[in-house]
């Protein structure tokens, strides 16, 4: 939270909207002194409606020309935002996409004076160029991007209420619908790393359904008019990445075959024509998902067992 106010910006020129999603911990108490010290902070309280609803409500309340959506547990690098905002205001770009660092808690604690060096440089691209050249489907992070508010509202971009993985369809839709964009390797955020194993361990049917909904909404983007073939192919490949993530989580965290079947049926109802055709791996996976899901999981379990056996040779 404090890193937001270390950006070299005049507080009269921007607003900070805090959406309290019915937190049960002491988060709001911890930042009471920060709220009291800054007149440009607005607090919105909601009853545990999910991060996606919190973001939608924050966007609806925003008045500024550009919107940044940092996560509460991540950090902005000191004085990293102003060059991006200046370029955004100068070019009226729909999106300004920056780079970030991944660090663990111990690394963050030891990095007391982390800043960019030199000047930020930018490359102008269209949204579809950005999609093809820069979007990693495993890193659909909305907090690394400045969004022009009129672009979000004009294109009716919203986060799917009540689900996790909402960044995936939102980021894909934003890139595909954007006009002028600016890309920079300037570092904006520090992404707090270290909870990946916990995410796998806590995966359950609700999260599986959420991922299915995210896959379904991303799949519907294929209906956009005049998508170049290269864009359509990458979109299909990106959806396959999300589908593979679903399979991985189900394999390691959903043990009951009836639960796995229910999740697949849930996905089939939302994407009846889900099919992947780029390469042998996609074709085989797609065929087994559609016609032999139990056999597919059996082979995946055997492969998991074989590759995890200790080598005594």
Model-derived features: positions:
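Amphipathic alpha-helical repeat scaffolds of TPR domains
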Residues: 236-248
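Donor-binding/catalytic cores of nucleotide-activated saccharide
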Residues: 51, 72-184, 191-203
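A conserved acidic beta->alpha catalytic loop
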Residues: 3, 20-30
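Short aromatic/hydrophobic "clamp" motif used to bind/position activated sugar donors
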Residues: 67
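Catalytic core of nucleotide-sugar-dependent glycosyltransferases
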Residues: 186-195, 201-229, 245-274
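Membrane-interface aromatic/basic loop that binds lipid-linked glycans or pyrophosphate carriers
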Residues: 252-313
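Conserved donor nucleotide-binding strand/loop of the catalytic core
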Residues: 14, 28-63
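Short, acidic, metal-binding catalytic loop of nucleotide-sugar glycosyltransferases
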Residues: 2-13
């Amino acid at each position: 939270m404090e890193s937001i106010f270390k950006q070299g910006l005049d507080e009269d020129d921007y607003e900070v909207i805090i959406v309290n999603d019915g937190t049960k911990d002491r988060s709001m108490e911890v930042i009471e002194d920060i709220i009291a010290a800054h007149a440009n902070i607005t607090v919105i309280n909601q009853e545990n409606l999910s991060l996606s609803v919190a973001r939608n409500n924050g966007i609806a309340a925003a008045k500024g020309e550009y919107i940044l959506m940092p996560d509460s547990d991540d950090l902005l690098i000191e004085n990293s935002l102003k060059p991006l905002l200046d370029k955004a205001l100068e070019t009226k770009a729909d999106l300004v996409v920056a780079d970030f660092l991944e660090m663990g808690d111990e690394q963050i604690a030891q990095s007391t004076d982390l800043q960019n060096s030199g000047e930020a440089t930018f490359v102008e691209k269209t949204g579809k160029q950005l999609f093809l050249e820069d979007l990693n489907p495993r890193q659909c992070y909305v907090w690394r991007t400045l969004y022009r508010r009129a672009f979000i509202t004009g294109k009716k971009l919203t986060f799917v209420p009540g689900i996790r993985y909402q960044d995936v369809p939102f980021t894909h839709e934003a890139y595909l619908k954007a006009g002028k964009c600016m890309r920079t390797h300037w570092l904006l955020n520090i992404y707090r790393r270290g909870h990946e194993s916990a995410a796998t361990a806590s995966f359950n049917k609700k999260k599986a359904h959420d991922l299915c909904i995210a896959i379904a909404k991303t799949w519907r983007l294929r209906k956009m008019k005049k998508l170049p073939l290269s864009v359509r192919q990458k979109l299909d490949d990106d959806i396959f990445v999300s589908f593979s993530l679903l399979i991985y989580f189900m394999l390691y965290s959903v043990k009951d075959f009836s639960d796995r079947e229910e999740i697949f049926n849930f996905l089939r109802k939302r994407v009846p024509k889900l099919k992947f055709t780029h390469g042998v791996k996609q074709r085989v996976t797609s065929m087994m998902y559609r016609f032999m899901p139990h056999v597919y999981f059996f082979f995946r379990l055997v492969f998991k067992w074989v590759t995890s056996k200790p080598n005594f040779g």
